[in-house]
């Protein structure tokens, strides 16, 4: 394998300005997200507290991810199909 000489990277003024703009944008998004969490936390729909019961926590997770569990039937025909003994 041929080895190349290292290429020199130069930092330009445009690169620095772009970095600063992106960093400011990320900081404003983070502050907005924190503000929403603070407002949502007072309604009870924000972060899950430690004192909440497991059913409500489970229900909040189900609502958040959109999972709708279907109960499984407990009869033998559903477990073994149409096999006869």
Swiss-Prot record:
Q: Which keywords belong to this entry?
A: Cell cycle, Cell division, Coiled coil, Mitosis, Nucleus, Phosphoprotein, Ubl conjugation pathway
* S-S bonds: none
Q: In which compartments does the protein localize?
A: Nucleus
List every position bearing Phosphoserine.
42, 82
User: In the UniProt record, which is one GO cellular component term?
Assistant: anaphase-promoting complex
Q: Name one GO biological process term.
A: protein K48-linked ubiquitination
- Pfam families linked: ANAPC_CDC26
- Pathway assignment: Protein modification; protein ubiquitination
Major localization class? nucleus
Q: Which residues form a coiled coil?
A: 7-38
InterPro entries given for it? APC_suCDC26
Q: Where is the composition biased (Polar residues)?
A: 73-85
Q: Where is this region: Disordered?
A: 30-85
Known role: Component of the anaphase promoting complex/cyclosome (APC/C), a cell cycle-regulated E3 ubiquitin ligase that controls progression through mitosis and the G1 phase of the cell cycle. The APC/C complex acts by mediating ubiquitination and subsequent degradation of target proteins: it mainly mediates the formation of 'Lys-11'-linked polyubiquitin chains and, to a lower extent, the formation of 'Lys-48'- and 'Lys-63'-linked polyubiquitin chains. The APC/C complex catalyzes assembly of branched 'Lys-11'-/'Lys-48'-linked branched ubiquitin chains on target proteins.
Subunit-level organization: V-shaped homodimer. Interacts with CDC16. The mammalian APC/C is composed at least of 14 distinct subunits ANAPC1, ANAPC2, CDC27/APC3, ANAPC4, ANAPC5, CDC16/APC6, ANAPC7, CDC23/APC8, ANAPC10, ANAPC11, CDC26/APC12, ANAPC13, ANAPC15 and ANAPC16 that assemble into a complex of at least 19 chains with a combined molecular mass of around 1.2 MDa; APC/C interacts with FZR1 and FBXO5.
Q: Which family does it belong to?
A: Belongs to the CDC26 family.
Matching PANTHER family: ANAPHASE-PROMOTING COMPLEX SUBUNIT CDC26
Q: What is this protein called?
A: Anaphase-promoting complex subunit CDC26
């Amino acid at each position: 394998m041929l080895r190349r000489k290292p290429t020199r990277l130069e930092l330009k003024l445009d690169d620095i300005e772009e970095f600063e703009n992106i960093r400011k944008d990320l900081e404003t998004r983070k502050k907005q997200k924190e503000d929403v969490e603070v407002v949502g936390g007072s309604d009870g729909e924000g972060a899950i507290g430690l004192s909440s019961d497991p059913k409500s926590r489970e229900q909040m997770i189900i609502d958040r991810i959109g999972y709708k569990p279907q109960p499984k039937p407990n009869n033998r025909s559903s477990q073994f199909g149409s096999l006869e003994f």
